[in-house]
């Protein structure tokens, strides 16, 4: 093969990767959930920015256990992180408070898309999906994610539980 043919192939690959790279870049992650999970507040602030509100509280699990907690609101209240025992263990993402494309996410169809926006595998099979909730369990580094709809079948909010001991 001559050098002109090689250059044409290389240029073709560069154009191909440039086009696909640009389409992926147009849909950035909301944030990488695995980089927030179990992390202390200073690490979370590097990803989500400074909190707009911080409240000392008590977290009550569904099993009746209580833990001293700090609740921090990020991104103008769209993301609430509950810090238990020093780490981000429980998150609530108010999808309808996020800007742009997130407000148009429909339930249940776009629940998988939202997983990808959180840096997780969009092809993960849900453990449960019905009119009230879509649930994924035992994702790498994350115990449970629950997506809840509005009455208009949009995604309303997401609960993320990092470790089952806080369930």
Regions found by a protein language model. Give the residues of each.
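Short, solvent-exposed mixed-charge patches
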Residues: 165-167
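Long, charged/polar, surface-exposed segments that mediate recognition or autoinhibition
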Residues: 77-133
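Short linear loop/turn motifs
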Residues: 57-64, 126-134
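Bacterial N-terminal signal peptides that target proteins for export
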Residues: 1-10
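Short, exposed beta-strand-loop hairpins at the edges of beta-sheets
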Residues: 136-157
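Sec/Tat signal peptide C-region and signal peptidase I cleavage site
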Residues: 20-27
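N-terminal secretory signal peptides
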Residues: 29-73, 78
